[in-house]
């Protein structure tokens, strides 16, 4: 069996969740301490949410004032390599997380937008010294997740699938393999599988609620309330849950490969153990599980050390429990 990926998601830029920032939320000293912790807990990959956090030559207008230079990125890639860690860039082309694009966010699905996407994908591959993967994000693109924004935009149906197809093609042309969250796939299984083959993408499923009735836990309160406002009060009736649990394992029968991604962000500490167990036992072949990634969903700053360290320890514990030391 090939060596599993044991990854952690971290942030360089924070402009993917809120209106575009003017600086990084990133502490250099804490980052170095974090890398040592990763090495100590067996992490062999960091997926770094880059966004506008590097200096783009093709689109300098989107880069933050303290964005990393090419030289800085190269030094960090080499630093990680010495610790046995791959540093993988992540962008996010979901309209719910595209503030980092600046004005291009408002040009979604137009020629200037496609040109921009192609440019930054090619450049991020070069900046990160030819990484094995490029993560494209693509989570939480819907009315529900967009409606709190001042400028609401989201794609659906065939347009969404066509844009995903374009992004994957542009990524794989670089030599990297495209990665993405599961969200638009489990909502559009037939259209997605017709458009994108199992060898063209790695899927990162995330799920912070109950996988089975045998191991239930409470739905996250704000999401529960959001659906209650629409007249849906039973967890089993939540559409995103129904579609996820209905489709996520059967997709593997078609040959798609996964890196499932648990989190401790909502205080559900057993999500990591449950996620590793669910996919290890439920996949048709363990070879299709390339590994697992923990996502603390926190800025790379020292006030989040306790929760970030916990996420790493939880992944280590699950790895040792289900895959051995």
Across the structure, where does each feature detected by a protein language model lie?
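Alpha-helical scaffolding within the catalytic cores
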Residues: 119-121, 185-192, 239-249, 275-278
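N-terminal hydrophobic targeting/anchoring segments and the immediately downstream early-domain regions
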Residues: 1-32, 41, 105-110, 172, ...
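Aromatic-lined carbohydrate-binding surfaces of glycoside hydrolases
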Residues: 9-202, 207
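Charged, glycine/proline-rich intrinsically disordered loops and linkers
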Residues: 34, 217-239
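Substrate-binding cleft of secreted/luminal carbohydrate-active enzymes
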Residues: 247, 254-325
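Hydrophobic beta-strand segments of well-ordered beta-sheets in folded domains
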Residues: 4-8, 44-46, 134, 200-202, ...
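Extracellular/periplasmic catalytic domains that process cell-envelope and extracellular macromolecules
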Residues: 1-3, 127-128, 194-198, 251-253, ...
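Substrate-binding cleft/loops of secretory-pathway carbohydrate-active enzymes
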Residues: 105, 178-227, 267-284
């Amino acid at each position: 069996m090939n060596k599993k990926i044991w990854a952690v998601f971290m942030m360089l830029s924070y402009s993917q969740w809120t209106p575009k920032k003017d600086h990084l939320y990133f502490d250099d000293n804490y980052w170095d301490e974090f890398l040592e912790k990763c090495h100590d807990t067996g992490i062999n990959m960091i997926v770094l949410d880059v966004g506008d956090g590097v200096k783009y030559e093709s689109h300098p207008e989107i880069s933050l004032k303290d964005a990393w230079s090419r030289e800085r990125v190269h030094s960090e890639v080499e630093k990680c390599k010495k610790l046995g860690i791959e540093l993988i860039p992540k962008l996010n082309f979901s309209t719910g997380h595209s503030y980092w694009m600046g004005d291009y966010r408002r040009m979604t699905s137009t020629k200037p937008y496609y040109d921009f996407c192609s440019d930054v994908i090619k450049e991020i591959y070069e900046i990160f010294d030819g990484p094995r993967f490029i993560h494209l994000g693509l989570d939480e693109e819907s009315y529900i997740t967009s409606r709190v924004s001042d400028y609401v935009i989201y794609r659906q149906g065939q347009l969404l699938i066509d844009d995903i197809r374009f992004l994957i093609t542009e990524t794989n042309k670089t030599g990297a393999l495209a990665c993405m969250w599961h969200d638009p796939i489990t909502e559009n299984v037939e259209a997605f599988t017709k458009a994108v083959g199992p060898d063209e993408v790695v899927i990162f499923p995330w799920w912070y609620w109950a996988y089975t009735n045998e191991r239930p836990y409470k739905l996250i309160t704000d999401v529960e309330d959001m659906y209650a406002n629409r007249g849906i009060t039973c967890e089993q009736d939540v559409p995103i849950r129904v579609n996820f649990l209905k489709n996520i394992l059967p997709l593997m029968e078609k040959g798609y490969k996964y890196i499932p991604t648990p989190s401790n962000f909502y205080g559900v500490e057993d999500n990591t153990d449950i996620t590793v167990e669910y996919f290890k036992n439920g996949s048709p072949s363990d070879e299709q599980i390339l590994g697992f990634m923990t996502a603390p969903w926190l800025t790379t700053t020292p006030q989040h050390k306790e929760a970030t360290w916990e996420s790493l320890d939880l992944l280590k514990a699950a790895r040792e429990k289900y895959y051995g030391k």
